[in-house]
């Protein structure tokens, strides 16, 4: 997936060295660059449905601790555009996501922020702690903060649960190559106007972009920003009512028809939205070769 170390080390699929896969006809295959290379290509970003993976072999990276910064700001469109621009050009070691949202009633936020529209910048800097403090400080200095938390923590601490569950959600996903004042204003207006939406913006680049688009089934290597719009509701049926508004806002914040497969809804055109035509054709060929009867299917 696309995580907090991706700008520095690449996507998770870029560190996959090999896999053992049971195919539809019962064979156990060793799959890597030299053995079953087409299947290995498809496993890296293809979304599944190709076999049963019984073992994965990954390249590992030693990460002792990271600098984590969680900074909350007033929901200002000019600041949002500046934040996204700054973080998109940051060093590869600094990963980030920027949320425009209504602060949820979770334990790690003080009660005075609960229910308040905010911009949240989540920063993760792997490597030298002093450099991490400096990079977080550059973001802190962009505007007065409502709340800030900066700490040295194990990388695993960044991946813990956020403490809220039991709600319905509908998402829209895209990629953007620019995020200027107009798009920032759309994002801020959507949240401050009372709609229960979260706009999530994730700078890409770095090591993600240093892999050829056709090297794996994830072809969107050169995109600058991943965008995710989510509508939250007490139950899924209520959330589904917001789907048209989610799709409209997602399209306004994105460039082109594509979105990150992990955040796309299971709609009839999901595959066409996740993969460019050439990638989708190659995936279909791999599927036909290894599972012609479509034994493995989720849709």
Regions found by a protein language model. Name each.
Residues 1-299:
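Soluble FAD-dependent oxygen oxidases
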């Amino acid at each position: 997936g696309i995580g907090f170390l991706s700008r520095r080390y690449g996507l998770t699929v870029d560190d996959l060295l090999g896999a053992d896969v049971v195919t539809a006809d019962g064979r156990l295959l060793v799959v890597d660059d030299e053995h079953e290379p087409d299947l290995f290509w498809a496993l890296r970003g293809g979304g599944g449905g190709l076999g049963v993976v019984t073992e994965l072999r990954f390249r590992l990276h030693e990460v002792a601790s990271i600098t984590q910064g969680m900074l909350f700001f007033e929901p200002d469109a000019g600041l949002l555009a500046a934040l996204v621009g700054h973080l998109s050009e940051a060093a590869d070691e600094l990963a980030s996501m920027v949320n425009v949202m209504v602060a949820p009633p979770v334990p790690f936020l003080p009660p005075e922020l609960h229910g308040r529209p905010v911009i949240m910048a989540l920063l993760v800097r792997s490597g030298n702690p002093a450099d991490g403090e400096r990079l977080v400080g550059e973001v802190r200095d962009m505007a007065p903060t409502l709340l800030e938390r900066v700490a040295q923590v194990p990388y695993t601490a960044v991946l813990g649960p956020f403490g809220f569950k039991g709600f319905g959600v509908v998402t829209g996903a895209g990629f953007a190559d620019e995020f200027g004042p107009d798009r920032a204003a759309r994002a801020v207006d959507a949240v401050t106007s009372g709609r229960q939406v979260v706009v999530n913006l994730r700078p890409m680049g770095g090591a993600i972009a240093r892999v050829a688009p056709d090297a794996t089934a994830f072809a969107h290597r050169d995109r600058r920003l991943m965008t995710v719009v989510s509508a939250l509701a007490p139950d899924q049926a209520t959330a589904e009512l917001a789907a048209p508004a989610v799709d409209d806002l997602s399209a306004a914040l994105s460039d082109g028809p594509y979105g990150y497969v992990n955040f796309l809804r299971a709609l009839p055109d999901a595959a066409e939205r996740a993969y460019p035509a050439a990638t989708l054709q190659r995936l279909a060929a791999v599927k036909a070769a290894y599972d012609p009867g479509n034994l493995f299917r989720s849709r």
